[in-house]
Amino acid sequence: MAQGLASSTHRTYKSAQLRFVNFCSQAGRLHPCGSPCPASEWTLCLFTTHLSSSLCSSSIKIYLSAVRSMHIDLGLSDPLVDCLQLQRVLRGIKRTQGSTGSSRLPITDHHMLIIYKSLCLSNHDHLMFWAASTLAYFRFLRSSEFTVSSLSAFIPLVHLSISDIAVDSHVSPSCLQLNIKASKTDPFRKGCCLYIGMGRPPLCALSALIQYLPLRGQSPGPLFLLSSGQPLSRALLTRWLKDIFAAAGIEGSFTSHSFRIGAATVAARSGIPDHLIQAMGRWNSDAYKLYIRTSAEVLAQATSMLSK
């Protein structure tokens, strides 16, 4: 039954379920058999209130989904059905917390130039980082699509590897093909091919990858490897970004997902049609609009246009 969940979802649920069990144990909400299931609506309300001190309402819903999954695994009925009191508690938490929105900032073309100037591309690790950064930016990649937490966590049928890269010409390349075998919105691993053309130097993913691939070699494993042989992880990527922008005097929350947000933002600013932005980011709905960040300057200019 565990195969019905993506591996990342399974890990998230497992952590949430452990927290639920610990809460029930400490709050005296366990059944005589020692199990928290089946959970009553009142138990779920107490758990939700407990979580609200450290989690936002959207994260709390993920924890409740994990509790539902626990019940399903045990062959029990869905504990969230017809829970009117629980729904009111959730609405109250959302109203109290307010709408904070995403704090993650976009990495735009301006930020990409800052990253480039901070690196020494004759260094293996720096070149690898630049190749990964440009690929993530120009192809709107999610961090899970190009990073791996460790060598032992690498799954050939899921993660990006050297065999997933192909160029149209080794003499004068003009296009690179990237095979994404699995992603957040592709749970059945149908896969998709992404294409990358030449950019304007130094912001060119094709050029960066062409430089990196000879250093990477043809050995099996993750596409992006440090000189030590360890893979580029999301944690390492985020730490490098934080250090680079801190050294440049730029404050804010930049993460591995900032490449995707920045790509959508710059694409919209550059006048790329909505349907192309949606296709480039592989969004199945209008959710891509949530990724576009509009600066205060642009909004101010827009109001002035109303008087023309």
Where are the model-predicted features located?
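Extended, non-catalytic subsegments within catalytic or DNA/protein-binding/adaptor domains
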Residues: M1-K308
